Structures are given as structure tokens and as C-alpha cells.
Amino acid sequence: LPVAFLKFAIVLILFIAMSAMIEAQCIGNGGRCNENVGPPYCCSGFCLRQPGQGYGYCKNR
């Protein structure tokens, strides 16, 4: 196999692994969240919190 192909394959594998790690650091819909505390944030980008509650739940807008 050509060296260029092996380099490309290694970079591709690293990119896929990093993408999976970044995605795993967010909270899925239905999970508890607190936008005031910081990461991890909701994957959807929206944390629904009722007034008076210390936490909310991730959901789509």
C-alpha cells in the first residue's frame, strides 16, 4: 500500500474517534441538564427548566 494512503487512513480514523468523543460529551433528549453549571450541554442545544427548579431536561425546541 502507498504511504500516502496509510497516512490518510490514520488521519481518518483519528478524526472519527475524536468526533465520537465530542458527541459523547453531550446530554441526549430526556436527560437532566443545568445550563448554569456548564458542560456537558444538551446535544439539541436546548435545556427546558421550569422556574424554581435547579435543573431541567434536554429536549428539541
Swiss-Prot record:
Q: Show the SUPFAM superfamilies listed in the entry.
A: Gurmarin-like
| Alphabetical UniProt keywords | Antibiotic, Antimicrobial, Disulfide bond, Fungicide, Knottin, Plant defense, Pyrrolidone carboxylic acid, Secreted, Signal
Q: Reproduce the UniProt comment on modification after translation.
A: Three disulfide bonds are present.
Principal location: secreted
Q: In which tissues is it expressed?
A: Found only in seeds.
* Signal peptide limits: 1-24
UniProt record, GO biological process: defense response to bacterium; defense response to fungus; killing of cells of another organism
Q: Any idea where this protein resides?
A: Secreted
Q: Which residues, renumbered to this chain, carry the PTM Pyrrolidone carboxylic acid?
A: 25
Q: InterPro entries in the record, alphabetically?
A: Antimicrobial_C6_CS, Gurmarin/antifun_pep, Gurmarin/antimicrobial_peptd
Disulfide bond residue pairs = 26-43, 33-47, 42-58
**Cellular-component GO terms for this entry:** extracellular region
Family of this protein:
Belongs to the AMP family.
Q: What is known about its subunit structure? A: Homodimer.
Report the function annotation for this chain: Possesses antifungal activity and is also active on two tested Gram-positive bacteria but is non-toxic for Gram-negative bacteria and cultured human cells.
Q: What is known of its domains?
A: The presence of a 'disulfide through disulfide knot' structurally defines this protein as a knottin.
Please identify the protein, giving its name as recorded: Antimicrobial peptide 1
What organism is the protein native to? Mirabilis jalapa
Q: Identify the coding gene.
A: AMP1
